[in-house]
């Protein structure tokens, strides 16, 4: 009970073998699910080799599910009213609002979800993992050396969406 989280519904685990490289995904809406590609992980651009890939992937993806599914009284009220956790559909733009009301934490910035999951996977591996990688240390040391600006979470989100990538 690390998270103090009571799941709204069961978490479905789908193991698949349709690719030549390992990966995983998680969702908290319309249901709790984890999908794991069982092929070996590609370590080409990684900063560490996981001791046991299913342990690492399960910790990482279950953190995503817990963060997206966690609920309070207001969320529970909307979930009961809407009959569950609606998934946003392109054909029904209003479903974006219903999804936000029932599962607001699904819509947090990606850096928050990924940062939390990477921290937890590293913690569960006894301090070995991507949260302690040399790459991150190099980036922060370079930023200090270059007197680069460290953004606050709000400033980072604002700056990140202000640039036109097209």
Q: Which positions does each model-derived feature cover?
A:
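Active-site-proximal alpha-helical
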Residues: 104-134, 140-166
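Juxtacatalytic substrate-recognition/specificity segment
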Residues: 1-102, 109, 158-164
